[in-house]
Amino acid sequence: MAERMKGLLPLAVAVGILAFLWTWVALNFTFHWVTNGDLGNGLDLPANFHLIVPAAFVAWAMFFAAGGDNEAAKKVAIANVFGAAAAFVVLWGAGELADLPDFWSIALLVAVMAALLVVLGGLGDWFFIPATFGAFASVFFWWIATGLDKWAPGGGGVGNSVKALGDPATAGAGAFGGVISTPIGWVFVNILACLTIGVVLGMLSTRLAALFTPKPKPVKHEAPPAGSAVA
């Protein structure tokens, strides 16, 4: 077990470094660098386009689950698009069938899209079903966190400004009093972007780990004693 853990150390260091950098960049991007006004508590109001830390970790994990190589990166990148698109159908269609407070439209579309993603696995080995579910879940989760826009009328907020945040009619239903209220189109774009970043992080982590892996020492071959017979 000790040898196995020792063998994982280069990858562990690489993942730790990249995880720190991604988390630091994503949170600063969302709450300090690209924003729409001062919230008065040391943080800023996130713009409609923002970065979501956990989404990248989902795709990063799927990269390793798919094999952790270039082929895995392709599989997960494709799966991200299919899964996110399937979730967007739910986001858009649920409110068309039945909006707040009826959940049956959400449940129905989730069932249909989940079944469809499984069936599409028959297209070939390139269609990695687990990653499609990871992408689907990421979009769906962020939709809930950001106010269930379209299903909940005005749930994604209106105007995305500090002034709009101060009015219950325009603040939206997102977490933290509407701070992360987001329209469904941006929910889709933001999560898909972060899922793609997760694939890149996976590829970078394997390459960085290779740099940290000690090179095997060359084996020294001793010269035969002088006068010995050579077979």
Q: Where are the model-predicted features located?
A:
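Short, highly charged, low-complexity non-transmembrane loops/tails of multi-pass membrane proteins
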Residues: 211-231
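Cytoplasmic-side transmembrane-helix entry/capping segments in multi-pass membrane proteins
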Residues: 73-82, 103-108, 127-136
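Transmembrane alpha-helical segments of multi-pass membrane transport proteins and ion-pumping complexes
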Residues: 15-28, 80, 84-96, 110-122, ...
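Short juxtamembrane and helix-loop transition motifs at transmembrane-helix boundaries
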Residues: 1-3, 18-44, 62-74, 86-100, ...
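Short, tandemly repeated low-complexity microdomains enriched for cysteine and small residues
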Residues: 72-77, 153-154, 191-192
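Pore- and pathway-forming membrane helices of multi-pass small-molecule/ion transporters and channels
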Residues: 16, 20, 31-68, 111-117, ...
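Individual transmembrane alpha-helices with interfacial aromatic-anchor signatures
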Residues: 176-201
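N-terminal membrane topogenic signal
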Residues: 1-14
